[in-house]
Every structure is written in C-alpha cells, then in structure tokens.
Amino acid sequence: MAVMNVNPTRMELTNLKRKLSTARRGHKLLKDKRDELMRRFLDLVKENKALRIRVEEGIKQANVNMEIARSAMNDKSLSVAMMLPTQEMSLDSSEKNVMSVMIPVFDVQYKTADKNDIYSYGTAFTSAELDNAVSALSEIMPDMLRLAEIEKSCQLLAGEIEKTRRRVNALEHVMIPQYEETIKYISMKLDENERSTTTRLMKVKDMMLEQAHHYDDPFGM
C-alpha cells in the first residue's frame, strides 16, 4: 500500500491517527448497515417468492374460470356484465425509510360503501364461473400490490447494498491500510530524526567536555 504524500511531523501523525480512528468507526457502522440491509433484503426475497407463487396461481385460476365463463356465455352478455363495475378504488402511494432507503408503500382506498361488493352484474344471465373469476381477481389484488411493493423495495435495497459494499471495501482495503502505512512511516521517520538529534547532541556534549578539559589544564599536564 502506497504511503500518503504528507509531511512526517508530529502534528500530521496526530491528524492521521484521528482520521484512522474515524475510518475504523465508519467501517464498523457501514458493515453493520450492510449486514442489516442484507437481512431485510433476504426477508423480502423470501416473502416475494411466496407471494409470486400465490399471485400467479390466483391469476391462473381466474383465467381458467374466465375461459369457462366465456364458453358458457355469449360475448355480448359477458361484455355487458363487465361494463359497469360497482366497486371503485384509488391507490395511494407513499414511502417509508428503511436504513436510509426510501421504499414504496401502496394503500388501496375503496370508494364504495362495501368493499366486498365486487359484482357489477346480476346473476340471472351470468355463470358461476364468471363469479369465481371476479372473486379470484379481487382476492389477489392486495397480494399483487404487496408484490409490487416488495419487488421495487428489493431493487432499491439491492442498489443500496452494493453502494454500501463498495464503501466498506474502500475503507477496508484502501483507506485504512493507507492510513496505517503512513502512520507507520511517519513514526519511523520521527524515531530516526530523534535518534539523529540525540547522536548530534551527544557529539556536541563530547566536544564541549573535551574543550572544558583543555581549559582546565592549559599546559596539558
């Protein structure tokens, strides 16, 4: 790891030690965040798998019932039956914060008095299979909305996990080792300078003692 281009001074050493301490704390916090994001992501993936199976099965069953109803009814009767739905709804979209990631939240608001009133037709000229198809689609609507929430949330969490992973790796493999190597280098340089200064002082001391000895004995006796 390359040493940073800094002056090997005690002030710089203190500054780098402070930065290293901050980097280590940041590294731990980011690792904890990454691990928690992964845990939540995997929980959502598990829920997504179960929901998708349920939704696909519900749509499949609704399609089967609709085909049976279409074969039992003429096209005009089927079109009239489905023309004017009695149930109205609106979709409210909001967001919630999960580990600094804003994920979507969908909420259905029913505008009719009875949200279970899903049939827009009378039963005199329709088949039971049409009732079953409409009922199946109505039942899976909440699951479809939740599935949309989860899939978008997984996409957003995956992006944040990757971004956090890159930051963790940058700290772990680049910044922290570089700080450590630079601190080691500066400490070594300061030790060398201190030893060099001590050696020079010892030489000066010896010279001064030798000169003092000559002054005390000017005749060399």
Go through the PLM ranges and name each one.
Residues 1-221:
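Charge-rich amphipathic alpha-helical interaction elements
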